[in-house]
């Protein structure tokens, strides 16, 4: 069921979204060569719990049937990992690209956002892929308006990405969000204009395209969480939580520092 947030609930979503963005700002200086992704998780967990007074939503989250609960507080997806990478003793190296995905719960409401980071100087391909994904996310967000449809968002993303000769992952998508981490509707990053659910003021959704440098096909690893590109090509993702307003949209997870 799609939930329409009251003005009071929207205010709580704004707070949760702002705090999630603060986590991504805080961790940025720590994303460097020689640092293990589990250390990034530890840093974020401590900040989320002790500094912000929030709950890290991914920790012990139960996803698909049969999969173990997610064991960490953030997702770290490096290079060809598309999404849901589990922080580990894997040490970052110069040239890596990494997506850090953070979801916090504050006063019962979720703020969900992710951002790409470069470890040292990126390759030309990595730089271009990351920028195209970022621009695609914003094209999708700018397609949000009351009376529009989710297909408008997906089409804006897909058409731009494919025009740039990259591919959009189809097996994973954005979602409604609020008191529940993953609510209806599904927010596909591909589609046709005018298709899908109508956008109504008070809806809160995530827009989080996953864009591959190679083919769009992905596979799920044996841990039940980590998703990688089948052809081992690089993948990038950006994410914001967005409120549908009477005038258009409001991004709830913008960095207080103006980034993202």
Language-model segment annotations:
Residues 1-260:
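Active-site neighborhoods and metal-handling regions in enzymes and metal-associated proteins
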């Amino acid at each position: 069921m799609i939930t329409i947030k009251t003005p009071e609930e929207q205010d709580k979503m704004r707070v949760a979204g702002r705090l999630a963005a603060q986590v991504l700002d805080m961790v940025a200086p720590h994303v460097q060569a020689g640092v293990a992704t589990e250390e990034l998780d530890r840093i974020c967990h401590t900040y989320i719990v002790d500094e912000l007074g929030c709950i890290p939503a991914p920790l012990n989250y139960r996803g698909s049937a049969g999969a173990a609960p997610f064991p960490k507080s953030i997702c770290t997806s490096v290079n060809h990992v598309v999404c849901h990478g589990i922080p580990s003793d894997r040490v970052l190296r110069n040239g890596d690209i990494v997506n850090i995905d953070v979801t916090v719960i504050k006063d019962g409401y979720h703020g969900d956002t992710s951002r790409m980071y470069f470890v040292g100087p990126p390759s030309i391909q990595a730089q271009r892929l990351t920028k195209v994904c970022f621009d695609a996310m914003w094209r999708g967000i700018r397609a949000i308006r009351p009376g529009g449809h989710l297909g408008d968002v997906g089409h804006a993303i897909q058409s731009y990405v494919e025009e740039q000769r990259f591919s959009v992952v189809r097996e994973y998508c954005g979602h409604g969000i609020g008191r529940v981490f993953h609510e209806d509707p599904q927010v596909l990053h591909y589609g046709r204009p005018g298709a899908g659910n109508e956008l109504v003021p008070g809806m809160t959704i995530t827009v989080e395209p996953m864009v591959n440098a190679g083919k769009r096909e992905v596979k799920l690893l044996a841990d039940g969480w980590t998703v990688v590109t089948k052809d081992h090509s690089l993948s990038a993702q950006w994410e914001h939580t967005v409120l549908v307003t009477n005038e258009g949209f409001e991004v709830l997870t913008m960095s207080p520092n103006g980034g993202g």
